Regions:
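Bacterial Sec-dependent N-terminal signal peptides
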Residues: 1-23
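Sequence/structural signature of beta-propeller domains
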Residues: 17-306
Length: 306
């Protein structure tokens, strides 16, 4: 079992005009956090070039890890990494980890993991990813996933060279019948400035209010492979998402500029979000950031529903 140290950077509470509150920030000695999920009061974090799935308790303390790969390097080389970017909980309480698909065959992979028994199975997604190119996705770069009633939503991140974010809707167990499962896509967010592109990086679903929570980051890259200079990060909130599954395009109902909440978000490339609690008026969120230097950060925040 491998454990990873957590370095506490700061813990504070401030209020701001947009009714969001940053509660806590911690730095993780874990490479390239790209996805986070919350289940049974534990956090499960994947890194796009990490050998292990990291497990934290409810206070962000490392308590376990699940080995997926056995490279000697702390960070798997870019040319062969699986680029696991998305994580979600399936309807039968399994963790589904999904590779980006941006470099075949290495990144056309998924893992299905039982968080209780730690049983894990690897899944090839070649057939499913080949089909996605028939649905108008020019450059494949799967960055997030979440389960909604009756479906799974994936997000494909665009770039300055391919400025299109797309939500992909498919069946709950899409990997079991990849040649035949239904697929539909929704162009999400409008690109109005050619000098910057806001790329979707993660998804979470608030089931009580039927909201899709989307993490978005800006990065100066013109393709689906390379990293670039890190810009600002945002949360997009899309209301009534289950009633919009057949839409062809949609824009967020609410945009939250994270750097405007607190300067601790400056220079942080937010990669993913999970929901720990939802009340009538508030969403309790935890986000992770990958800073492209082999370290990661985790943020706890509250945002008011609007």
């Amino acid at each position: 079992m491998r454990l990873f140290f957590v370095i506490i950077v700061t813990s504070f509470s401030i209020s701001c005009g947009n009714n969001s509150l940053l509660k806590e920030v911690k730095q993780l000695d874990y490479p390239s956090a790209s996805g986070i999920e919350y289940f049974n009061r534990q956090y499960y974090i994947i890194g796009d070039d990490a050998n292990d799935l990291l497990v934290l308790d409810s206070n962000f303390n490392p308590i376990d890890s699940i080995q997926l790969y056995s490279f000697t390097e702390k960070r798997i080389p870019k040319a062969v990494k699986a680029d696991l970017e998305a994580i979600t909980i399936t309807k039968d309480n399994k963790l589904l980890l999904i590779g980006s698909g941006s470099l075949s065959p290495y990144r056309n992979i998924a893992w299905l993991i039982d968080p209780v028994t730690k049983q894990k199975d690897s899944i090839r997604l070649d057939t499913f990813y080949q089909r996605l190119t028939l649905y108008g996705i020019k450059e494949l770069n799967i960055e997030g996933a979440c389960a909604i009633p009756g479906s799974i939503i994936l997000c494909n991140r665009g770039s300055k060279g391919y400025p299109k974010n797309q939500l992909i809707l498919t069946s709950e167990n899409f990997w079991k019948d990849q040649a035949n499962v239904p697929i539909s896509t929704i162009l999400t967010g409008s690109a109005t400035d050619s000098t910057v592109f806001n790329g979707i990086s993660g998804l979470a679903y608030a089931n009580k209010s039927d909201r899709l929570i989307v993490t978005v980051s800006t990065e100066d890259t013109r393709n689906n492979m390379d990293d670039g200079a890190i810009g600002k990060s945002y949360l997009w909130i899309i209301k009534n998402i289950t009633s919009k599954k057949n839409w062809k395009t949609l824009n967020p109902d609410q945009v939250i500029d994270l750097e405007a909440i607190d300067p601790k978000f400056k220079g942080q490339k937010i990669e993913s979000v999970c929901i720990t609690k939802e009340t009538k008026n508030f969403l309790y969120l935890v986000l992770v950031a990958d800073n492209d230097n082999g370290s990661s950060s985790i943020f706890k925040m509250i945002t008011e529903k609007k």
